[in-house]
Design a protein with these regions (language model features):
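A short helix-loop-beta-strand connector motif used in the catalytic cores of GNAT acetyltransferases and
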Residues: 44-56, 84
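Conserved acetyl-CoA pyrophosphate-binding loop and the N-cap/start of the following alpha-helix
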Residues: 94, 98-106
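Conserved beta-strand in the GNAT
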Residues: 56, 63-72, 84, 89
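A conserved beta-turn-beta hairpin within the catalytic core of GNAT-like acetyltransferases
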Residues: 73-85, 95
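Conserved catalytic-core motifs of GNAT/GCN5-like acyltransferases
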Residues: 75-78, 120-126, 132, 137-146
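A short beta-loop-alpha structural element at the N-terminal edge
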Residues: 2-16
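Conserved GNAT acetyl-CoA-binding A-motif
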Residues: 111-123
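Conserved GNAT-fold acetyl-CoA-binding loop/helix
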Residues: 19-42
Length: 146
């Protein structure tokens, strides 16, 4: 298995992984459609302008079996930008092999090399143990559905 940077040519794979991730978390089909419609232009633009750094995991046969990325957003705080890990996904038949861990470590290293003081993410129930093992901590972020 190898981890490689994603390119603009990997756009469809990134979108497919994002939708599969939410499907695995139990989101209904109608919500998945909305997520895809909103995600496509944002990811396309962010991939093109460098606001999204993605990586893909390839099996020994060179098929893509997982991926993840960092979305860099403007943020008024101690740093002018904030890094958000997103779209961490591994196809079911390749899970429990440390692939997600390597994807996330690669993304953390990328953030560290660019001078970010922290990196954020929203963890799924299944992903939370991995992120805690890597040192992520729960924060006091809150949300109000409108």
């Amino acid at each position: 298995m190898r981890i490689r940077p994603a390119t603009a040519e990997d756009f469809e794979t990134i979108v497919c992984h994002r939708i599969a991730m939410f499907r695995d978390m139990g989101y209904p089909a109608a919500v998945l459609t909305d997520i895809e419609e909103v995600s496509r232009p944002i990811l396309h633009h962010s991939l093109a302008n460098g606001g999204y750094y993605g990586v893909l995991a390839e099996s020994d046969g060179a098929s893509v079996v997982g991926g993840g990325g960092v979305l860099v957003v403007a943020w008024p705080g101690t740093q002018p930008q904030r890094a958000w890990i997103q779209n961490v996904y591994v196809v079911p038949e390749f899970r429990r092999r440390g692939i997600a861990r390597e994807i996330v470590r690669t993304l953390i290293d990328w953030c560290r090399a660019r001078g970010f003081h922290s990196v954020n993410l929203h963890a799924s129930t299944d992903g939370r143990p991995l992120y805690e093992q890597l040192g992520f901590e729960a924060t006091n972020e809150m949300r109000l559905a409108l």
